[in-house]
Amino acid sequence: MSLLTEVETPTRNGWECKCSGSSDPLVIAASIIGILHLILWILDRLFFKFIYRRLKYGLKGGPSTEGVPESMREEYRQEQQNAVDVDDGHFVNIELE
């Protein structure tokens, strides 16, 4: 006899689970683990960037710049700022009267 035939049997109304309401400790533990897994998976998908950045860099805000000359740090900051700045030449100004 397979596990499927022991747990679920077809009825007139559809599929019914015989183990609902069971007080078996294994069923209760499996249910709790399943619910916790679902909650953790949802939280992981919602906050994965923050979580993994925190794990990778710890309490620091990003990669360490220790040992890098100040001129290179300033050059890097300038490159990052230029990448963020918007080029106004790509936009068309439309004035409505």
Curated annotation (Swiss-Prot):
The M2 protein from most influenza A strains is inhibited by amantadine and rimantadine, resulting in viral uncoating incapacity. Emergence of amantadine-resistant variants is usually rapid. It is found in: Virion membrane; Host apical cell membrane. Its main location: virion. The record marks 41 as: Seems to be involved in pH gating. Residues 44-97 are intravirion. The record marks 37 as: Essential for channel activity, possibly by being protonated during channel activation, and by forming the channel gate and the selective filter. Residues 1-22 are virion surface. GO terms for cellular component: host cell plasma membrane; membrane; virion membrane. InterPro entries: Flu_M2. The modification Phosphoserine is found at residue 64. The keyword Transmembrane applies. It comes from the Viruses. Residues 61-80 are annotated as: Disordered. Homotetramer; composed of two disulfide-linked dimers held together by non-covalent interactions. May interact with matrix protein 1. When the channel is activated, one or more imidazole moieties of His-37 probably become bi-protonated. Belongs to the influenza viruses matrix protein M2 family. Forms a proton-selective ion channel that is necessary for the efficient release of the viral genome during virus entry. After attaching to the cell surface, the virion enters the cell by endocytosis. Acidification of the endosome triggers M2 ion channel activity. This is Matrix protein 2. The gene is M.
